[in-house]
Each structure stands twice: as structure tokens, then as C-alpha cells.
């Protein structure tokens, strides 16, 4: 289950969101948290911090951009964010950085950079959402289970997941629309 943005932190709907997340977790759902925290909510950081921590604790995967972490923690560097802010709550961390390599950190000291395909993007709107979609596609395609996640993913599993995530994100940037093409979707469907 993918959740994120300010909606996942908003105190007004927090009881409903927290209840839904707890229900999903209790029933074995894999929880992927895209922090997606924007500067427009910067003045609310102190108010939402307890909800943020609770989301981090419930998540199996935490993804955010270096911009998110620059706003939230005043540190955009993946290692600093993971070690100081994330790893205590969630062991699987993904930090996207636009055209720069995606940084992954996980249990047992796993740390790897995944270079982005060099291209001239038509638009980057939707790149993060499509990265998330590609990651979830990878979980399904690779048959990654709750047991795999609890045990800790292998480097090969991470590599495959990041290939899928980056393929979706790159495809999205090739056009003015904020989603992958129908043709790309048809090709990906054949991989399932």
C-alpha cells in the first residue's frame, strides 16, 4: 500500500489515516511511504512531527526526495538523513535526487547508489509518482513478499526494484504528460 504527502500527516484526518494504516499493517500489507513534504507546509513541521514518526514506524519502505529532507530536516544528504532521522524507525530508505543517482540504504549496512539515465527531460512532473509506481510494479513482478521484506532484501532484489522504479520515472519524463505511455504499459504487462 502506497501512502504519503501532507494528507498522511494532516492532524485533521489523522485518526482515520492512522486507523487505516494500522489495519493494513495488521493484515500483512506492505507499506510504502512517500514522504512528499513540500515547502508550503514548512511552518507546520513541529505540529506534524509525531504523525511523521508514526508513519516512519509503520512503513516497510520510506522514500523521499532530497528536497523533502532539506525542508524537514535541513539536511538533503541521504546518509545523514538515514542515520539521524530514518533508520531508527524504518530500515529501508530510498532518496531520490532528480537527475542525480538514487540513494538506497537498508539494514545490515546496505548502501548503494543507482545512477539515473542521462536524458533531456520534456517534463519532470509526475516523475516521483511514477518512480513509486515502478517500485510497486517491481515488488509484484519479482514476487517480493512480506517474508522477504522482514528478512531483508538482497542486493539483487534491490537492483531489480530500482531498475523498475527508474524505468517508470524515466518514461514519464519523455513527454508532457505526467504518466507513462500506453505502449510502455503494454510492454511492462508482458513482464508479469
Residue ranges of model-derived segments:
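Conserved phosphate-binding/catalytic region of the ribokinase-like
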Residues: 22-23, 76-192
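Flexible, active-site-adjacent loop/turn segments at secondary-structure boundaries
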Residues: 4, 35, 123
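N-terminal glycine-rich phosphate/adenylate-binding segment common to multiple enzyme folds
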Residues: 1-8
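Conserved residues at the C-terminal ends of beta-strands
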Residues: 4, 65, 96
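Conserved beta-alpha-beta core of the PfkB/ribokinase-like small-molecule kinase fold
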Residues: 8-80, 100-101
